[in-house]
């Protein structure tokens, strides 16, 4: 997928505290503040550090990291929404419900990450998230976040 990003890696790094090797979002393809939704992309390469041990003979992306990538994509949207409070608050991944893994993600895959918030409040939020490779859903779940003061962590 060669869509021009709405937000590039520098923008993402301004919105998320994650850095290599744990930054799992490469670009934001679109977001909509009215529907509270976001679409992001992760290019999965054989150079990912987790492929060294998961699994050398048949590398697949760990499911928990697919969920983390979804949470990071949702976190970017929360960062945009929190624009005025970004210096004071940070969204932390609180939990996941109904997680399902449907297909393996392999080196060379382009992971499309979609999240839509069903709830955003001063205390946190909930989002429905799905990861795709092509038109196939590879993972999905309901993500929960808590908003905390940066000084408290």
UniProtKB/Swiss-Prot annotation:
Enzyme class, spelled out: lyase
Location of the active site: 54
Family under the similarity heading: Belongs to the thioester dehydratase family. FabZ subfamily.
One GO molecular-function entry: (3R)-hydroxyacyl-[acyl-carrier-protein] dehydratase activity
EC number: 4.2.1.59
Function: Involved in unsaturated fatty acids biosynthesis. Catalyzes the dehydration of short chain beta-hydroxyacyl-ACPs and long chain saturated and unsaturated beta-hydroxyacyl-ACPs.
UniProt xrefs under Pfam families: FabA
Protein name (database record): 3-hydroxyacyl-[acyl-carrier-protein] dehydratase FabZ
Subcellular localization, as worded in the UniProt entry: Cytoplasm
Record field: catalytic activity: a (3R)-hydroxyacyl-[ACP] = a (2E)-enoyl-[ACP] + H2O
GO terms for cellular component: cytoplasm; membrane
Keywords carried by this UniProt record: Cytoplasm, Lipid A biosynthesis, Lipid biosynthesis, Lipid metabolism, Lyase
Originating gene: fabZ
Gene Ontology biological process terms from the UniProt entry: fatty acid biosynthetic process; lipid A biosynthetic process
Main location: cytoplasm
């Amino acid at each position: 997928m060669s869509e021009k990003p709405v937000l590039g890696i520098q923008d993402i790094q301004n919105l998320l505290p994650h850095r290599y090797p744990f930054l799992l979002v490469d670009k934001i393809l679109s977001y909509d503040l009215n529907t509270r939704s976001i679409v992001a992309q992760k290019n999965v390469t054989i150079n990912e550090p987790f492929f060294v041990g998961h699994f050398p003979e048949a590398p697949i992306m760990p499911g928990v990291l697919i969920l983390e990538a979804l949470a990071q994509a949702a976190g970017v949207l929360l960062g945009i929404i929190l624009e005025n409070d970004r210096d004071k608050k940070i969204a932390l991944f609180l939990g996941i419900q109904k997680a399902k893994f449907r297909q393996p993600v392999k080196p060379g895959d382009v992971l499309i990450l979609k999240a839509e918030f069903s709830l955003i409040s001063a205390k946190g939020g909930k989002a429905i998230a799905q990861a795709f490779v092509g038109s196939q859903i590879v993972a999905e779940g309901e993500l929960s976040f808590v908003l905390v003061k940066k000084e408290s962590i």
